[in-house]
């Protein structure tokens, strides 16, 4: 384990104390879990404190745990070039409780937060322009949530006659296949189009 991360973990526990829910040192990485109402204070501290100096926000991502009451983790990936250290800060929230925006602390957070909103529906209070960034206008749902259907709700295509993009309900050309992933020898329970002859010889 990197000795610098062990020292940093102890330092953050000492300085941030009640603002943190837990600290995790695993696989050579330090993760701290912040209370939802303390996230801006924690981010400002790790940016401005001379022992930390995590001045670069490299990513904000979401993770969906549908079985939890606070189903979303918002994960901030930070870099301190001066100390050559990385830090992950997590905060937990639900579908209706917004996380305070980090845009005033890290200006680069704006597009990362828009992506988390678009993909997961995570809300950020105080964001200057919280709207979709990757999906199309009028898109329904949030595609990286675990309860979002794999096939989606609609499909879009260019209609040559109408000379525009149109949206239609998803039509599956074939049923979902049933694969037996537990057996290395057993395949699908039906005959594939190219195997009729082989099946007839049995």
Swiss-Prot record:
InterPro entries cross-referenced by the UniProt entry: NADH_DH_suC, NADH_quin_OxRdtase_su_C/D-like, NADH_UbQ_OxRdtase_30kDa_su, NADH_UbQ_OxRdtase_CS
Topological type in the membrane: Peripheral membrane protein
GO CC annotations, alphabetized: plasma membrane
PROSITE patterns, per the entry: COMPLEX1_30K (PS00542)
Gene3D superfamilies the record matches: NADH:ubiquinone oxidoreductase, 30kDa subunit (3.30.460.80)
Highest taxon above the source species: Bacteria
Keyword annotations from UniProtKB, A to Z: Cell inner membrane, Cell membrane, Membrane, NAD, Quinone, Translocase, Transport, Ubiquinone
Gene Ontology terms, MF aspect: NADH dehydrogenase (ubiquinone) activity; NADH:ubiquinone reductase (non-electrogenic) activity; quinone binding
EC number: 7.1.1.-
Principal location class: membrane
Keyword Cell inner membrane: yes
Subcellular location(s) per record: Cell inner membrane
Catalytic activity entry: a quinone + NADH + 5 H(+)(in) = a quinol + NAD(+) + 4 H(+)(out)
Sequence similarity: Belongs to the complex I 30 kDa subunit family.
The protein's role, per its UniProt record: NDH-1 shuttles electrons from NADH, via FMN and iron-sulfur (Fe-S) centers, to quinones in the respiratory chain. The immediate electron acceptor for the enzyme in this species is believed to be ubiquinone. Couples the redox reaction to proton translocation (for every two electrons transferred, four hydrogen ions are translocated across the cytoplasmic membrane), and thus conserves the redox energy in a proton gradient.
HAMAP family on file: NDH1_NuoC
Subunit (UniProt): NDH-1 is composed of 14 different subunits. Subunits NuoB, C, D, E, F, and G constitute the peripheral sector of the complex.
Listed name of the protein: NADH-quinone oxidoreductase subunit C
Species assigned in the record: Bartonella quintana (strain Toulouse)
Gene that encodes it: nuoC
């Amino acid at each position: 384990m990197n000795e610098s991360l062990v020292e940093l973990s102890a330092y953050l526990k000492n300085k941030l104390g009640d603002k943190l829910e837990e600290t995790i040192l695993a696989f050579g990485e330090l993760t701290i879990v912040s209370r939802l109402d303390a996230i801006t204070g924690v981010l400002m501290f790790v940016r401005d404190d001379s022992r930390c100096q995590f001045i670069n926000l490299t990513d904000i991502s979401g993770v969906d745990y549908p079985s939890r009451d606070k189903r979303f983790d918002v994960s901030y990936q930070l870099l301190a070039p001066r100390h050559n250290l990385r830090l992950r800060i997590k905060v937990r929230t639900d579908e209706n409780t917004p996380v305070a925006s980090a845009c005033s602390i890290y200006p680069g957070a704006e597009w990362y937060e828009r992506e988390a909103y678009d993909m997961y529906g995570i809300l950020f209070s105080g964001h200057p322009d919280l709207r979709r960034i990757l999906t199309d206008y009028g898109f329904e749902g949030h595609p990286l949530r675990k309860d979002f259907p794999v096939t989606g709700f609609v499909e879009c295509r260019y209609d040559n006659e109408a000379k525009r993009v149109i949206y239609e309900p998803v039509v599956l050309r074939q049923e979902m296949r049933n694969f037996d992933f537990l057996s290395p020898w057993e395949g699908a329970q039906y005959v594939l189009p190219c195997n009729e002859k082989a099946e007839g010889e049995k």
